Amino acid sequence: MHTPVLTDRVLELLAPALSRPGAVVVDATVGLGGHAAALLAAFPEVRVVGLDRDLDALAHSGERLRALAPERVRLVHAVYDEIGTVLAGLGSARVQGVLFDLGVSSLQLDTDARGFAYSRDAPLDMRMDATRGLTAAEVLNTYDAAALARILRDYGEERFARRIAESVVRARAVEPFTTSARLVDLVRDAIPAPARRTGGNPAKRTFQALRIEVNSELDVLARALPAAFDALAVGGRLVVLSYHSLEDRLVKRELRGYAETLVPPDMPVVPAGAEPRLRWLTRGAEPAGEVEKADNPRAASVRLRAAERTAPNPDRTQPTIGGAS
């Protein structure tokens, strides 16, 4: 059974917003439905809108969640930057909570045919939505060396990005890449021997970079966070679980602007409409506790940030937390 990460803390942070009558929460990455199931159980009146780009995940979570509370669940095949469009289609003007549990899911990692895991030989796919987009194999076989080096450096924080990229280009001229084992071997051979002995599997950063590129993860997240903020009613809460530093830094940067006033710092009075629209609920990024890390390996790298919407957008009226859509 999949164990969701930091469930108790997520429920604690969302509780003040979701305890109100008629509350709606968006699980923007519903996955196998672990967090959503906990939300349905903890808040007997809350309605959950679950989004996922992975049809396999939606099939699993749909079976699980509809068995719990079919009348309180709506699941939608969508990417999480489409929150606004999805809510408009459902007739929900504002919601009281939004949850993001980012990164690759347990289902994706455990299904060999999806190609996310570097520990097993499998087709190089890595698409979270298997119905569209380039596969990892197509990226490896078509991007030039400069583009490959860029994504390895920017998305994998790989020190040996250029060496790996050049090795990929040479190898694919002999035979195109199709499966993961060959790529794992290439990465191991491309980097200096001392680097192979530190930091776990040498291919980890390359696989992360390819996955982020294939799914446009950081670009989607940069669009999704403002969309989620706009969807929140005043008093609504946003919780984000990140699993690597690129995600966490992006979350901090995108939300920081909402926590600042819209006037110069030397102004003696902050006029109405220029006050901060968000307050942080967490001090920095919170990790999981040692007990949870021991019980749930996926919790080892998690970083949680949470915030509450405190004001509407300038020159715009919107309902407060009591006015659920």
UniProtKB/Swiss-Prot annotation:
EC numbers, comma separated: 2.1.1.199
Cellular compartments annotated: Cytoplasm
Entry-linked Pfam families: Methyltransf_5
Disordered, as annotated region: 285-325
A molecular-function term among this protein's GO annotations: rRNA (cytosine-N4-)-methyltransferase activity
Gene3D superfamilies, per the entry: Putative methyltransferase TM0872, insert domain, Vaccinia Virus protein VP39
Substrates-to-products reaction catalysed: cytidine(1402) in 16S rRNA + S-adenosyl-L-methionine = N(4)-methylcytidine(1402) in 16S rRNA + S-adenosyl-L-homocysteine + H(+)
Binding site for S-adenosyl-L-methionine: 33-35, 52, 87, 101, 108
Predominant subcellular localization, coarse grouping: cytoplasm
Keywords from the UniProt entry: Cytoplasm, Methyltransferase, rRNA processing, S-adenosyl-L-methionine, Transferase
HAMAP family: 16SrRNA_methyltr_H
Role, per record: Specifically methylates the N4 position of cytidine in position 1402 (C1402) of 16S rRNA.
Protein's recorded name: Ribosomal RNA small subunit methyltransferase H
Taxonomic lineage: Bacteria, Bacillati, Actinomycetota, Actinomycetes, Frankiales
